[in-house]
Design a protein with these regions (language model features):
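Sec-dependent N-terminal signal peptides
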Residues: 6-11
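Periplasmic peptidoglycan-binding/tethering modules of Gram-negative envelope proteins
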Residues: 22-106, 183
Length: 183
């Protein structure tokens, strides 16, 4: 009988000796504990959708999804004068909004595609379309976008958005389009 009581006491002592006095709190967050501050791990699950980040309320701006990318275009806004690549004042507020979103979301990358109307040589239009894309990139950077997250490409007169038979159509073809994606 004494052996049984002794065995039970030893077992109880062994169980209490193996228990920890630390409190475990489960499901408190993901990340590293540093003085009770948690760094949330940046996972796909907790990222906002691109549509919630890239938001415009200006007329003439269209945003559509193609696969994992957003395509932002401004078909109703005249972005560039004939044979010019200077960014027009009327579009600067929208571009500043885009730059702010890009600066605040470092994982977002953007490709700027520049276009021209069909007047001029193919080589000249290709060069002009690159200058237009670069002018937009430079403006975005000046307003807080991260330059290394922006690429540019010129397409000249390829892929017209409108007819080249009228001045109004040619004006809409002098444009850039933005392909926005997660990096």
């Amino acid at each position: 009988m004494k052996k049984k009581i002794f065995a039970v006491l030893m077992l109880a002592l062994l169980v209490t000796a193996c228990s920890s006095s630390k409190k475990v709190i489960k499901n408190t967050g993901v990340g590293v504990d540093s003085a009770n501050k948690y760094a949330i791990e940046d996972t796909e699950a907790n990222k906002k959708p691109l549509e919630d980040i890239i938001v415009f309320d200006q007329e003439g701006v269209t945003i559509r999804r193609e696969g994992n990318n957003l395509i932002l275009s401004m078909p109703e806004l005249i972005l560039f004068d004939f044979d010019k690549y200077a960014v027009k004042d009327g579009i600067k507020p929208s571009l500043a909004t885009l730059a702010k979103a890009l600066g605040e979301n470092k994982d977002i990358h953007i490709k700027i595609d520049g276009y021209t109307d069909f007047i001029g040589t193919e080589a000249y239009n290709l060069e002009l379309s690159v200058k237009r894309a670069r002018a937009i990139k430079d403006f975005l950077i000046s307003k807080g976008a991260i330059g290394s997250n922006i690429s540019i490409e010129g397409y000249g007169e390829q892929n017209p958005a409108d007819t080249n038979k009228t001045e109004a159509g040619r004006s809409r073809n002098r444009r850039v389009e933005f392909i926005i994606s997660r990096g």
